């Protein structure tokens, strides 16, 4: 969960057309004024290159050398010297005189920008999870890298850059999240340092300020809303240490983080390193064995056993958070990491905790409980309790309460127009400019920098910029741009920049320009620790089902359960389990539990939806009672019963809670219920709903008419009928549902665009209630990075609509706002690329038909057409941000819309020949769609294949033997031995069933432990020879004695006392009882047939 972005005017700004791309220069000269000073003509290359920050030694200010200075200090790199205090700060300069409005950009205007706080860049891996695993194993096996794994705590991102540098949440600052963060961080110092805490707090803040550093933490607390389990204590865990310097942020390695944290006595995470093929493959196998039932104790124990190095956390997850573990983060790091970690662990032992037994004052929960009236009261109380080192001023939270904290949006325009004062500024301008040009889903929010209030003058302005990326698609698209422009700085998560706009009369300095250009050569790092970029950024997040059932299945399903009912909720959680690839057994268990939960909470709450921020108040007692019923239930739930009551101290949070899911969507296994919404094949004895997730102009009505009149229908006797949306009065989909109930075995052509998930849920509900399948038909298109429909497709749709006459829905050439209407439909699909769009439809409905639209050999879209569409999209974004869904003929941009609608028509008419020529002929399209529908109607359709991986299915490791070879051995034994032939007679069918699953068990999770089963992963899928030497049997069971061979000279050892292949068990006898056959033989209760010579059979080592 992360802080919601602060509210404010979300209107977009029109970036100035002409942006100055040339560089200016700035040296950090000493000055008696607070204005930046431009370099002289004698500035050397060496001096400007020193603007690139160099790593510092970590440690306390009193115990280590001071920070390396970059040149001399100036107002550009200093916090204002006025000494902010909790009262009396003069903010009149900020709000007096409309300084920004009067600040004009000319040749003497410069900008200095520095990153003030940031977290790691977010790289969206384009590979599947399985491909990432394979690459990780390959790199570790070759000695090119080490795999690092850490615990994923359930909390909020919190960043701290010193008492003047500021405190930040993921996309905001100056709110309850950061107030709680500062309080908890200060309390960690008091707990660690005891009576020395005030002195160490001051030193720590001074150290961060002088070295321009930022530490990032996971803030885990019970006062900011529920995750998977309410933590037993409030704490932080340091996850990143960043040197911001005067250039590109430099992140510490994990060993450096641990060294830094142990010197300052800050909490560190539990970390494991895997540097061999055996250990890294064992890790992935251990996770697969635990992912459906793992809790903190079992996971940490298993990883401790298989890892090469284990570094325990400063705070035990079980003691401060609880047993419910969100997940693990695995990433590739340098092959030297193990050696570096060993050195750090040797030189920096865990520090003492001097304040453990001291009275630290009121706790976070006590303070929040005492100030429940409003959020500002809670923040003030928390900040007063922090002390002067961490909070010398509360200006960041309250500023001047008679004025807004946000600044005018023109800050960004002037930032981009100004000459960059140094190389770092030029790179930040490059980032923002590209994100705007590519229209990435991001907001650039500017705020007054209250810490610099005393330094402000008409020619010297200071602001804070928050770069808020709205969706993961923004990171994906930016990463794609980095492939074409390797010199781009990464797009960071938690991205805050200090901006200084100022005037200088020194003129331009050509030597400084050259110096800055040369500095850029030193910025490209090439490979990180010898790793190529793609490999250096390999990371995978792995979450546990015990956490997901609480957050994703219970909490995130509340709105569906209360709004749409139990049936829709069931569809939701089945789809989630399918996406995750949950094993069949767990699906059945979860269905039973979640159905019971849905009935329980609806009965208790009625129509009053349970709050997602306090859902555990109801869910935890329910889960506790459910777990007590059986051991199986207890394993499913993981842990329950230690509920922390939050109702009296929950912080007042303005806005919805946010959760980073980071789930990779895959086709899952067969759902656990007999009537799933998603079907592996469409059944021909059911009804059929054909619907269109499309845009006006896709020819769906014309297609429906042709399909309705097609001779012979769809090859069977089911009636076909259609319902045209433009002719239906009232709500359309309830009418379709009525028709389905009247004619449950009919084929319904739903002639209406179905553009969003709410409609898809209604269709799923119809399918479930009326025993029908649904088939989506979509116009084929390459799409864009964030939309399943390309601009080419959009152009054709608009062209078709503007050729219509007398359209029933009044959307034709006479419609004055037709272009706006199509843009509105187009944006309903925003946020999904083509692959994501199609995958979700297939996951929901089990089928998909692509309606041919554009010829593959067409020439590119003409520039005038592309340009007018892009202008329309920009205008739509401006309009929707300011006015929401208000008609285009109303509002601020009405005149611009009128002008654009005319320009659109003129442009499309001028390019009508091109737009007509690129379309697939209508008759060809109809024929292809009809044939695919016939296949579906017959029940012969199978959905497109996709990678399927069953997680959580590892229970034991075994060698899988070919059934034909074992069967051949039995035939030979029967032919040579009448007694054996007599024994086998009458058991052929049951033996054949066993032979289909014949295997030699090596280790079982319940009997031998997760780590033991996982240890076989280094030989996964390798052929292992097995020598069969004898057959032992009686009237209840029979099995072959097996001697397991070796792989690459290493003997594969079975942990079973008697390795064997079970051939047969009588009814009521479990396979496990076959383990007793050797003892029964010694007791004279079983017979033995020696196989001479022994028979050798090979099979792959697999997990089951």
UniProtKB/Swiss-Prot annotation:
Residue stretches in coiled coil: none
Entry-linked InterPro entries: tRNA_lig_PDEase, tRNA_ligase_1
Cofactor: Mg(2+)
EC numbers: 6.5.1.3
Cofactor note: Requires the presence of Mg(2+) to exhibit tRNA ligase activity.
GO cellular component: cytoplasm; nucleus
Effect of residue 999 to A: Reduced tRNA ligase activity due to reduced CPDase activity
Catalytic activity of the protein: ATP + (ribonucleotide)n-3'-hydroxyl + 5'-phospho-(ribonucleotide)m = (ribonucleotide)n+m + AMP + diphosphate
Record annotation: effect of changing residue 804 to A: Reduced tRNA ligase activity
Activity regulation summary: Requires the presence of NTP, preferentially ATP rather than dATP, UTP, CTP and GTP, respectively, to mediate ribonucleotide 5'-phosphorylation.
GO molecular function terms listed in the Swiss-Prot or TrEMBL record: ATP binding; endonuclease activity; kinase activity; metal ion binding; mRNA binding; RNA ligase (ATP) activity
Major subcellular location class: nucleus
Homology family: Belongs to the TRL1 family.
PANTHER family: TRNA LIGASE 1 (PTHR35460:SF1)
Domain notes: Has three domains each corresponding to an enzymatic activity, namely in N- to C-terminal order: ligase, kinase and cyclic phosphodiesterase (CPDase).
Protein name (record): tRNA ligase 1
Origin species: Arabidopsis thaliana (Mouse-ear cress)
Gene it is expressed from: RNL
């Amino acid at each position: 969960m992360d802080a919601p972005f602060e509210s404010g005017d979300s209107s977009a700004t029109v970036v100035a057309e002409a942006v100055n791309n040339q560089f200016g220069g700035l040296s950090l000269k000493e000055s008696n004024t607070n204005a930046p000073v431009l370099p002289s003509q004698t500035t050397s290359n060496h001096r400007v290159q020193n603007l690139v920050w160099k790593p510092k030694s970590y440690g306390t200010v009193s115990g280590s050398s001071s920070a390396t200075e970059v040149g001399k200090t100036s107002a550009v790199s200093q916090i204002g010297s006025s000494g902010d205090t909790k009262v009396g700060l003069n903010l009149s300069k900020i709000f007096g005189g409309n300084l920004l409005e009067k600040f004009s950009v000319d040749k003497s205007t410069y900008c200095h920008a520095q990153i003030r706080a940031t977290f790691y860049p977010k790289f969206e891996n384009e590979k599947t999870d399985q491909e990432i695993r394979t690459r990780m194993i390959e790199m570790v096996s070759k000695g090119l890298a080490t795999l690092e794994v850490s615990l994923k705590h359930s909390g909020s991102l919190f960043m701290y850059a010193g008492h003047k540098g500021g405190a930040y949440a993921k996309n905001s600052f100056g709110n309850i999240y950061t107030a709680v963060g500062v309080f908890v961080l200060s309390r960690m110092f008091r707990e660690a340092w005891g009576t020395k805490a005030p002195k160490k707090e001051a030193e720590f803040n001074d150290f961060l300020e002088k070295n321009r550093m930022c530490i990032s933490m996971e803030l885990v607390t019970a006062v900011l809303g529920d995750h998977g389990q309410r933590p037993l204590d409030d704490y932080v865990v340091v996850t990143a240490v960043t040197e911001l310097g005067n250039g590109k942020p430099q992140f510490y390695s994990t060993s450096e983080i641990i060294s830094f944290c142990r010197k300052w006595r800050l909490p560190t995470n539990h970390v494991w390193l895997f540097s061999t093929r055996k250990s890294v493959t064992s890790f992935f196998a251990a996770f697969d064995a635990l992912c459906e039932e793992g809790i903190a104790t079992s996971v940490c124990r298993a990883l401790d056993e298989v890892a090469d190095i284990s570094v325990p956390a400063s705070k035990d997850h079980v003691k401060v958070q609880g047993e419910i573990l969100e997940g693990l983060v695995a990433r590739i790091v340098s092959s030297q990491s193990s050696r570096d970690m060993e050195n750090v662990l040797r030189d920096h032992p865990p520090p003492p905790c001097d304040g453990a037994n001291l009275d630290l004052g009121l706790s976070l929960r006590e303070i929040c409980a005492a100030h429940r009236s409003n959020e500002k009261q809670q923040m003030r109380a928390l900040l007063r309790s922090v002390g002067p080192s961490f909070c010398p001023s509360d200006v960041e939270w309250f500023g001047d309460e008679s004025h807004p904290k946000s600044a005018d949006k023109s800050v960004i325009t002037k930032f981009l127009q100004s000459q960059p004062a140094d190389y770092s500024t030029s790179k930040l301008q490059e980032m923002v400019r590209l994100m705007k040009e590519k229209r990435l889903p991001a907001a650039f929010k500017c705020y007054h920098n209250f810490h610099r209030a005393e330094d402000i003058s008409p020619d010297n302005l200071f602001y804070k910029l928050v770069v808020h990326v709205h969706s993961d698609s923004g990171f994906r698209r930016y990463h794609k741009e980095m492939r074409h422009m390797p010199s781009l700085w990464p797009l960071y998560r938690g991205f805050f920049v200090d901006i200084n706009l100022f005037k200088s009369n020194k003129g331009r300095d050509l030597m400084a320009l050259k110096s800055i250009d040369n500095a850029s050569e030193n910025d490209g790092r090439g490979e990180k620790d010898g790793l190529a970029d793609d490999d250096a950024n390999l990371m995978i997040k792995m979450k546990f089902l015990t956490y997901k059932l609480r957050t994703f299945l219970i909490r995130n399903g509340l709105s569906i359960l209360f709004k749409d009912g139990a049936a829709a909720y069931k569809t939701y959680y089945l789809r989630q389990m399918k996406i995750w690839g949950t094993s069949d057994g767990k699906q059945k268990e979860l269905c039973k539990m979640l159905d019971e939960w849905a009935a329980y909470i609806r009965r208790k709450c009625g129509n009053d939806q349970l709050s997602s921020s306090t859902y555990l108040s109801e869910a935890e007692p329910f889960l506790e009672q459910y777990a007590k019923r059986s051991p199986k239930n207890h394993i499913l739930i993981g842990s329950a019963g230690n509920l922390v009551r939050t109702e009296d101290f929950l912080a007042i949070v303005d806005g919805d809670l946010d959760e980073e899911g980071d789930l990779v969507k895959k086709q899952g296994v067969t759902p656990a219920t007999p009537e799933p919404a998603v079907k592996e094949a469409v059944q021909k004895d059911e009804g059929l709903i054909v619907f269109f997730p499309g845009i006006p102009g896709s020819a769906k009505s014309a297609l429906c008419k042709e399909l309705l009149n097609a001779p012979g229908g769809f090859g069977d006797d089911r009636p076909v009928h259609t319902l045209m949306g433009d002719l239906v009065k009232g709500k359309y989909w309830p009418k379709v549902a009525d028709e389905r109930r009247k004619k449950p075995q009919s084929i319904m052509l739903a002639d209406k665009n179905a553009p969003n998930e709410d409609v898809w849920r209604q269709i799923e509900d119809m399918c479930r209630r009326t025993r029908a399948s649904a088939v989506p038909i979509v116009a084929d298109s390459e799409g864009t990075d964030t939309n399943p429909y390309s601009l080419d497709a959009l152009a054709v749709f608009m062209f078709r609509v503007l050729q219509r006459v007398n359209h029933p829905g009044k959307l034709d050439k006479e419609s004055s706002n037709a272009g706006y209407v199509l843009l509105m439909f187009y944006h309903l699909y925003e946020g999904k690329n083509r692959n994501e769009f199609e995958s979700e439809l297939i996951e929901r409905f089990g089928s998909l038909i692509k309606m041919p639209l554009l010829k593959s050999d067409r020439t590119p879209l003409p520039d005038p057409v592309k340009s007018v569409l892009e202008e329309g999209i920009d205008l739509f974004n401006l309009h929707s941000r300011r006015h929401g869904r208000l008609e285009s003929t109303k509002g601020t941009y009405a005149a611009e819309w009128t002008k654009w609608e005319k320009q659109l028509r003129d442009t499309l008419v001028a390019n009508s020949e091109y737009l007509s020529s690129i379309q697939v002929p209508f008759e060809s399209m109809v024929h292809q769609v009809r044939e695919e529908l016939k296949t579906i109607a017959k029940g012969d359709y199978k959905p497109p294949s996709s990678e399927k991986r069953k997680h959580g299915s590892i229970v034991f490791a075994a060698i899988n033997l070919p059934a034909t070879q074992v069967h051949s051995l039995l035939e030979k034994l029967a032919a040579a031995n009448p007694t054996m032939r007599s024994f086998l007679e009458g058991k052929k069918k049951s033996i054949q069933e066993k032979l289909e699953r014949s295997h030699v068990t090596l280790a079982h999770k319940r009997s031998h432990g997760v780590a033991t089963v996982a240890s076989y992963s280094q030989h996964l899928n390798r052929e292992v020879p097995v020598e069969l030497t004898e057959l032992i049997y009686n009237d209840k069971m029979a099995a072959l004695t097996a001697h397991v061979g070796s792989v690459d000279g290493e003997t594969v050892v079975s942990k079973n006392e008697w390795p064997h292949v079970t051939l047969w068990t009588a009814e009521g006898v479990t396979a496990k009882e076959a383990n007793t056959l050797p003892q029964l033989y010694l007791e004279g209760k079983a017979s033995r047939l020696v196989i001479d010579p022994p028979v050798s059979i090979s099979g792959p080592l697999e997990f089951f």
